[in-house]
Amino acid sequence: MFNPSKDEVRQFFLSAWQRHRAGGVLTPLELIAADWMEQHPEYQAELSDTQSASRDYAVEQGRTNPFLHLSMHLSIAEQVSIDQPPGIRQAFELLRSRLGEHDAHHVIMECLGEMLWTAQRSSLPPDGAAYVDCVQRRATAR
């Protein structure tokens, strides 16, 4: 399983953004990342600053971690592409039809964060079925 360190993740985004801005050749994963970075102009100054790789992004300070946020976009895109956990693609499609791709990702992100928080707190593996159920509920809520 691919399990990069925090520093490797941050360097991935910084170098992909730099190559994207310079018109360089990107890997398929970097192309997906660059698309999400383009959709988040609020992060672009930090992505252009190599010092951002060593910053703390404490929620208590009201700072969103751009690397975590973009990583979640990549995770969700991968999950949807392979329908893992099963049912996530259908739930995403329902959300996308109502909200558009970007907003659908943000709704799914809330469920993903909730699932990971619950798993950490309970010292159990992430519950993919509960995650998909959360997304389905939000996709069908009026």
Give short role names for the model-derived ranges.
Residues 13, 33, 37, 71-76, ...:
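Short alpha-helical scaffolding segments that buttress acidic/His motifs in well-ordered protein cores
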Residues 2-64:
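Core of compact, soluble alpha-helical bundle domains
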Residues 83-118:
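A mid-sequence interfacial segment
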Residues 117, 121-142:
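Glycine-rich, aromatic-bearing surface loops/beta-hairpins
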Residues 1, 24-25, 87, 104, ...:
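Short, surface-exposed helix-loop/turn micro-motifs enriched in polar/charged residues
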Residues 1, 18-22, 35, 80, ...:
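Amphipathic alpha-helical interaction elements
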Residues 42-97:
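Heme-based O2/NO sensor domains and their adjacent alpha-helical segments
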Residues 6, 23-27, 69, 85, ...:
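Alpha-helix N-cap/helix-initiation sites
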